[in-house]
Amino acid sequence: MAADGFVYRWLLFGTTIVLLAEAAQRHTASDNPSTYNIGGVLSNSDSEEHFSTTIKHLNFDQQYVPRKVTYYDKTIRMDKNPIKTVFNVCDKLIENRVYAVVVSHEQTSGDLSPAAVSYTSGFYSIPVIGISSRDAAFSDKNIHVSFLRTVPPYYHQADVWLEMLSHFSYTKVIIIHSSDTDGRAILGRFQTTSQTYYDDVDVRATVELIVEFEPKLESFTEHLIDMKTAQSRVYLMYASTEDAQVIFRDAGEYNMTGEGHVWIVTEQALFANNTPDGVLGLQLEHAHSDKGHIRDSVYVLASAIKEMISNETIGEAPKDCGDSAVNWESGKRLFQYLKSRNITGETGQVAFDDNGDRIYAGYDVINIREQQKKHVVGKFSYDNERAKMRMRINDSEIIWPGKQRRKPEGIMIPTHLKVLTIEEKPFVYVRRMGDDEFRCEPDERPCPLFNASDATANEFCCRGYCIDLLIELSKRINFTYDLALSPDGQFGHYILRNSTGAMTLRKEWTGLIGELVNERADMIVAPLTINPERAEYIEFSKPFKYQGITILEKKPSRSSTLVSFLQPFSNTLWILVMVSVHVVALVLYLLDRFSPFGRFKLSHSDSNEEKALNLSSAVWFAWGVLLNSGIGEGTPRSFSARVLGMVWAGFAMIIVASYTANLAAFLVLERPKTKLSGINDARLRNTMENLTCATVKGSSVDMYFRRQVELSNMYRTMEANNYATAEQAIQDVKKGKLMAFIWDSSRLEYEASKDCELVTAGELFGRSGYGIGLQKGSPWTDAVTLAILEFHESGFMEKLDKQWIFHGHVQQNCELFEKTPNTLGLKNMAGVFILVGVGIAGGVGLIIIEVIYKKHQVKKQKRLDIARHAADKWRGTIEKRKTIRASLAMQRQYNVGLNATHAPGTISLAVDKRRYPRLGQRLGPERAWPGDAADVLRIRRPYELGKPGQSPKVMGANQPTMPMPMLGKTRPQQNMLPPRYSPGYTSDVSHLVV
């Protein structure tokens, strides 16, 4: 129930709104007049009768006439005298309060009378609808303020011309027009409309020549001379019937109406009695149907009044030509309602532009045949589905001038062309001729600087990929050429400049493109990249080589320094290894020094105990293990030190193995080819200070970076680094001044194949192609394109690639260079040899120091030996004297008392252990006389011994006598001790005891 109540309330609300609207409409309608007089100024009685009949029928058409509204007609006959016409309008139409006036006139009577009606009615703001006036003057709303017409003006035929040119693909035309208002209007309409029209189509027509003539011609010969020298053979002509006869007559005499020429004329010229066969013209549909236009004008008026009644109050029309009725505001608003009408009438779709001129008017395309027969070959009419005008032409039915069925090219095709090129290896090589040269080589072509005034400009020869292509192209499509170099050495880019008096900036091209745009050259044969900016102003053939953009860089190389052999380890690791060697050596020494088992004595041996590991031996051991050298002596003795030694040996094995592996990786293995991964490399997108990239300023690559929004940051960075030419940039890449050069892939691949140190990085991006540039609308475009396609199919382009771009032998050598393992040379290992040299020099230096030190030590030792010898000699002398005195004293004692006996221990025996160690051991200081007889004899001097078989003199009587053997037989003479080893002698005087 709630839902039903909601619906009921909405229905009640809607009904109330409708009733209120109807009430408001009834109120408005009640304030508006119920009768409307429509005036007619017509050319004949039939038109007057048809006008009255149409209004009567209108009153019964509820679609256009509201209830209680009635239309009445008020007509007068159009008078040839415009002044009389003005009076008739005031007396017979305005006095009857006409709300609008429909005007027609005879085509032969001129436009003065319709203009008089327009002036008079416009002065009182009464709308006027013309059905036959087509002059351009009626479009001027400053004069004809309230004039509309159901027929288009003559100059609207320019719109149809553009459609026809687009249909036939003509790109260059000559416009012929009279110097009157309509002639200049059609030229202005063509130029204005073409600027917006060609935004929606691919083919753009340009005006090569404009020929303006004074009406009422007597001769057109002078203009024909200029037309004949022009390139275009398509003529768009606006002329009256009389002037067209003169033009066709003179053009026929110059053979400009025959084969190869195209004439497209307006309606008036189509009716000349000498129109040549093959001429195409336009004819307005329903142009002479006054009845149809009368009906359409009446219904347009009724439609406007009906809408105005529903929206506002219409004031009464002026009643007389007095001053009191000058400002009729309702008439001005009614004129605006009329301009907004769009209905389907008897003459087609009826609508108006801001000037009140008919739009959507249909035309027939007429082809003149033999005996001036007019044959309709097409229509320009309104398409209801697309809600716009559409051109339909049956090309097969057209007979062109010269009775040709094939469409003319519309242009005079020159067979001798001005061809421009530019130095760009390997596509174009430029060589200056020597002083003794007079011609180029067979594979070269002369190529002077374009428009150069210097006499030396002709001393250049060109060869290369593009030159071979040009030679073959000229043979294939049969043309001759003059080859020249770019005047400024640039491909060309546009500069925005402000023309005098212009509100907007216009593009002005430089370089090769500028020469082509300004029509100073016919063709560009060079590595010219196809891009949208250039294609807007020049024509391109199909690409003769497909390519893209890539990055050129120098292959990364490790710098081979004197310490290259140290590269496998970082500096930190080397320092740690050096420190570890000495730390381990120190710990080994300490472990061996303080271990209770660090020193021991060999069992069953008279030798001293083996010495412990000292610090120098520990260092020697640590280095020996690390360097994998044999250790002969100085090894640890304790178990703890030996455990550390084994761990150190394992450490040394790992370090040496790692060093060996990394040394191979650093010095022998293949180096990486590139440093950059491509255009998406983060180092390029966020350019760092140590990474510079650039391209050629004003080039197609430069334009590409300008277009790409995602590369804007990168472009702003590289813009300051851009070069004037690609050659300069490539040289800087080789020198290492530029890290990345971004350019066309064809050129960079060529450079990389020529120099093994250069390489292209990443994949191609910005793919495009090289094309041959021609003028916009050039007749050679299709022929050049077809020839290039044939070259691709026949393999000719592939042959040029192999010959000029991919140098097979150079590339093969680069591949062999890359595949061959890198070998270590002196540059890599020089540091090792220097290290050996330093070791040798250090050893020599140390031995010199040792020799010098030893000499100093020997000199010191000699001085000590001399002093010791002198002391020994002095001591010997003293001891000898003491010995003699002692002997004499003993002899005296012996002589005094034979029974006196000396204690054996009173005489000391000094032995030189250094010279006679064995004797020193057996005759130690603890042994004294008497002793072993043999020992006594061995130490006595010869003069103290008796003769063989006798006892010594020193023996007492109480002592047993022992026979002595012959010394000469039992003891060799050399075993006799020297005098200083006699009893009582010692080298140390302090030990001498007598």
UniProtKB/Swiss-Prot annotation:
What functional role does this protein have? NMDA receptor subtype of glutamate-gated ion channels with high calcium permeability and voltage-dependent sensitivity to magnesium. Mediated by glycine. This protein plays a key role in synaptic plasticity, synaptogenesis, excitotoxicity, memory acquisition and learning. It mediates neuronal functions in glutamate neurotransmission. Is involved in the cell surface targeting of NMDA receptors. Plays a role in associative learning and in long-term memory consolidation.
Q: Carbohydrate attachment sites?
A: 255, 311, 342, 394, 451, 478, 498, 690
Q: Which residues cross the membrane?
A: 571-591, 649-669, 829-849
GO biological-process terms attached to the record: calcium ion homeostasis; chemical synaptic transmission; ionotropic glutamate receptor signaling pathway; long-term memory; olfactory learning; regulation of membrane potential
Residues that coordinate or bind glycine: 527-529, 534, 700, 744
| Membrane topology type | Multi-pass membrane protein
Question: Its quaternary structure?
Answer: Forms a heteromeric NMDA channel with Nmdar2.
Cell location: Cell membrane; Postsynaptic cell membrane; Postsynaptic density
| Record keywords, A-Z | Calcium, Cell membrane, Disulfide bond, Glycoprotein, Ion channel, Ion transport, Ligand-gated ion channel, Magnesium, Membrane, Phosphoprotein, Postsynaptic cell membrane, Receptor, Signal, Synapse, Transmembrane, Transmembrane helix, Transport
List the protein's name. Answer: Glutamate [NMDA] receptor subunit 1
Primary location: membrane
Q: Does the keyword DNA repair apply?
A: no
Database matches in CDD domains: PBP1_iGluR_NMDA_NR1, PBP2_iGluR_NMDA_Nr1
